[in-house]
């Protein structure tokens, strides 16, 4: 399939041929859901912690004698039922990450790209580079493209001026091709790819 290429100024820059196996699939929500869950689970810190009864700074001596008081039988005041006692089965630091096959991850990226192409929320630009690192000029360029909420993917190296100018624009993310991922694609309304990014994706999934 052929996709239209434009410049940052909104002018026509020809067309680029892309693979239907990358940009022309029927998006599957189950695949996208699995990949997003896998990504977000990996990001969780898992540092939550509550002290158990063995970790509470309190005497371990028996509270009072076993018999003769008329009260319930108790031993340590560290027990979970007491105020200030340890937490029963409380959270401990652990990783929330789970495995996901590489083929499913790759398929998820293809389906995310196809979803943007199918919904007409994919823009191909000739290059993510500007002469002057001015945020105002970049905002004007985005207005011509109709971009207000977007993920922008460039080649292996992002133009320093473009990256600096885009840093202060809300709802705009800029990543090199190595950082492309399903979650960031889906969380933004529009996906903007440079020609270098398209070529890298074609090479990656060849």
From Swiss-Prot:
Keywords: Ribonucleoprotein, Ribosomal protein, RNA-binding, rRNA-binding. GO terms for biological process: translation. One of its GO terms (cellular component) is ribonucleoprotein complex. GO terms for molecular function: rRNA binding; structural constituent of ribosome. Residues 64-76 have a biased composition (Basic residues). Gene3D superfamilies: 3.40.1370.10. It comes from the Bacteria. The keyword RNA-binding applies. Transmembrane segments: none annotated. Residues 63-98 are annotated as: Disordered. Belongs to the universal ribosomal protein uL4 family. Part of the 50S ribosomal subunit. One of the primary rRNA binding proteins, this protein initially binds near the 5'-end of the 23S rRNA. It is important during the early stages of 50S assembly. It makes multiple contacts with different domains of the 23S rRNA in the assembled 50S subunit and ribosome. This is Large ribosomal subunit protein uL4. It comes from Chelativorans sp. (strain BNC1).
């Amino acid at each position: 399939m052929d996709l239209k290429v434009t410049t940052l100024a909104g002018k026509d820059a020809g067309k680029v041929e892309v693979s239907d196996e990358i940009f022309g699939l029927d998006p599957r929500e189950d695949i996208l859901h699995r990949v997003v869950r896998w990504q977000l689970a990996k990001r969780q810190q898992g540092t939550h912690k509550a002290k158990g009864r063995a970790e509470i700074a309190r005497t371990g001596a028996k509270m009072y004698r076993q018999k003769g008081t008329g009260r319930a039988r108790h031993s340590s005041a560290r027990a979970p039922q007491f105020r200030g006692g340890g937490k029963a089965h409380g959270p401990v630091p652990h990783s929330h990450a789970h495995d996901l096959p590489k083929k499913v991850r790759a398929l998820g990226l293809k389906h995310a790209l196809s979803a943007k192409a199918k919904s007409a929320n994919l823009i191909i630009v000739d290059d993510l580079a500007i002469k002057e690192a001015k945020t105002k000029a970049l905002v004007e360029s985005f207005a011509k493209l109709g971009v207000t909420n977007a993920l922008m993917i460039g080649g292996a190296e992002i133009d320093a001026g473009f990256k600096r100018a885009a840093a202060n624009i809300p709802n705009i993310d800029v990543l090199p091709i190595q950082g492309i991922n399903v979650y960031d694609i889906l969380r933004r309304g529009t996906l903007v790819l440079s020609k270098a990014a398209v070529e890298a994706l074609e090479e990656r999934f060849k």
